[in-house]
């Protein structure tokens, strides 16, 4: 983000930094005695100031995490996070909650493994229960060449210090006997398992980062939509919002699928496309799927939530869109793959589906 941002640890926003109540079993017992009526707000609802050292557009996982680490690691707390809707209303609250680092390429593997290590210490770090559940992620293989490719991936992972296990069909059957092992078209040959992968409560991730950033002086401003970016001689000096102009020295963009629209306000054309990715949840079932299972013969992945619903998804919709809704042919496509992997899904009712907007780079790598 550059130098000369002041490095102020305590905020100078015309009000004192609020003390953070540390969540613990003792605070839980204390508030139980008062009927849970004296819990302080997890974060403030401040009015926008005239200017900040840093403004971050997007109050989702990436935007809130950026603000949190700026304040915690770099001592830069004169920061505002601008969210056009409510906090966590975008992709951080719309995904299928899977965390993993089972990648192969040199650029991807260390990047996602660093992320996995952050997940493993995240709850202690920001003192919030994000319900990180390292229940394992299993990718199925259905052909001999695919099994060889998984062996190659697993070896690459282990060279980089990432856990990986190559399982044969019998070991997979022991773990998940309800899979269709006798499917003549897609016989299960085995799979690659990362035991440290799993799921996390996505809303709690946003809440935890928001609480941690707010306690360090960051202003989290909801219902504040950026409508323009002001530049002077090619340098960003602030943003125009539906709540007035806000000046800044540095501007961060964490708007996910709307990144191209926001960047265009500053005259930038990003080399990305925006696509809808749908997700689904079923009716509640008894404990059924212990971990995360992905289909190797089609794009389908499924896990089970703490409420018993099966959370699953598949391919992105093939057309470009900024709308957070998908189309019915993709619903059929995803569930078709799910039933091919788990025939019992045919008898399960789907409660609802929703969509999130993916900002897709041409090579699948972050910019």
Regions found by a protein language model. Give the residues of each.
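Extreme N-terminal leader/targeting segments of oxidoreductases
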Residues: 18-54, 69-77
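Glycine-rich Rossmann-fold phosphate-binding loop(s) that bind the pyrophosphate
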Residues: 59-62, 84
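Glycine-rich FAD pyrophosphate-binding loop
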Residues: 71-92
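Dinucleotide-binding Rossmann-like beta1-alpha1 core, especially the glycine-rich loop
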Residues: 96-178, 299, 329, 337-339
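Short beta-strand to alpha-helix junction loop
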Residues: 110-113, 140-149, 192-211, 221, ...
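Helical element adjacent to the flavin cofactor pocket in flavoenzyme catalytic cores
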Residues: 191-250
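Central helical "cap/lid" subdomain
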Residues: 241-290
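Active-site lid/adjacent beta-loop-alpha segment flanking the redox-cofactor pocket in flavoenzymes
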Residues: 284-367
């Amino acid at each position: 983000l550059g130098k000369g941002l002041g490095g102020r640890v305590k905020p100078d926003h015309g009000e004192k930094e609020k003390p953070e109540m540390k969540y613990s079993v003792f605070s839980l017992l204390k508030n139980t005695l008062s009927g849970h009526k004296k819990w302080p707000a997890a974060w403030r609802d401040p009015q926008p100031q005239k200017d900040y050292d840093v403004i971050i557009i997007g109050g989702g996982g990436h935007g809130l995490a950026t603000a949190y680490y700026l304040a915690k690691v770099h001592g830069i707390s004169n920061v505002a996070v601008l969210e056009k809707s409510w906090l966590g209303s975008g992709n951080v609250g719309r995904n299928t909650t899977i965390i993993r680092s089972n990648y192969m390429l040199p650029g991807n593997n260390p990047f996602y493994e660093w992320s996995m290590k952050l997940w493993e210490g995240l709850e202690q770090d920001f003192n919030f229960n994000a319900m990180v559940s390292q229940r394992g992620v299993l990718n199925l293989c259905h052909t001999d060449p695919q099994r060889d490719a998984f062996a190659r991936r697993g070896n690459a992972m282990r060279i980089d210090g990432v856990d990986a296990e190559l399982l044969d069909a019998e070991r997979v059957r022991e773990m998940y006997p309800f899979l269709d092992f006798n499917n003549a078209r897609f016989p299960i040959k085995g799979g690659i398992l990362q035991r440290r992968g799993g799921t996390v409560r996505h809303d709690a991730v946003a809440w935890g980062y928001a609480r941690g950033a707010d306690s360090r002086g960051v202003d989290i401003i909801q219902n504040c939509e950026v409508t323009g970016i002001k530049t002077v001689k090619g340098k960003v000096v602030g943003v125009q919002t539906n709540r007035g102009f806000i000046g800044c020295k540095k501007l961060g963009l964490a708007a996910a699928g709307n990144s191209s629209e926001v960047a265009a306000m500053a005259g930038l054309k990003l080399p990305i496309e925006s696509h809808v990715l749908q997700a689904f949840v079923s009716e509640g079932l008894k404990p059924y799927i212990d971990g995360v299972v992905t289909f190797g013969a089609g794009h389908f992945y499924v896990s089970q939530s703490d409420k018993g619903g099966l959370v699953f998804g598949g391919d992105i919709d093939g057309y470009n869109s900024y709308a957070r809704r998908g189309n019915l042919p993709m619903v059929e496509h995803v569930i078709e793959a799910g039933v091919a992997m788990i025939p019992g899904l045919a008898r399960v009712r789907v409660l609802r589906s929703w969509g999130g907007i993916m900002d897709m780079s041409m090579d699948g790598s972050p910019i």
